[in-house]
């Protein structure tokens, strides 16, 4: 990774960390895709959008994948960079407790 890429990575981590640490209201959603994977999202408002700050996926085989500012990506996936729009996206609202149980594994 060159210096420009490192700086960009650092800015991305700082952005998501700041959103997570300073959030006053959190929204939680889930989605099941056509492959049977279950996706859970924690999102916070930023600039009139709901930005995902934590994302968990339970794969069809039962594997739990988690992404946040502390772990943005790996060989299996990455924290989405797309905002959530509950009116447009195929997600349903879940409680903070449900999201927390999934996140904790």
What residue spans do the PLM features occupy?
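N-terminal functional modules and adjacent low-complexity/disordered segments of proteins
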Residues: 10-14, 24, 59, 67, ...
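Generic secondary-structure transition motif, activating predominantly at the C-termini of alpha-helices
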Residues: 17-20, 45, 83, 103
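Short, compact, well-ordered microdomains
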Residues: 74-105
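Negatively charged, low-complexity tracts enriched in Asp/Glu with abundant Ser/Thr
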Residues: 2-40
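Short helix/strand-capping turn motifs
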Residues: 28-70
């Amino acid at each position: 990774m060159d210096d420009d890429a490192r700086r960009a990575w650092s800015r991305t981590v700082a952005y998501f960390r700041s959103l997570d640490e300073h959030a006053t209201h959190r929204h939680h959603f889930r989605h099941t895709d056509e492959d049977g994977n279950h996706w859970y999202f924690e999102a916070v408002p930023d600039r009139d959008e709901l930005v995902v700050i934590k994302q968990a996926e339970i794969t069809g085989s039962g594997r739990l994948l988690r992404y946040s500012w502390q772990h943005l990506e790996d060989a299996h996936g990455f924290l989405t960079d797309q905002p959530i729009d509950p009116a447009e996206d195929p997600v349903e609202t879940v409680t903070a407790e449900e999201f927390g149980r999934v996140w904790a594994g």
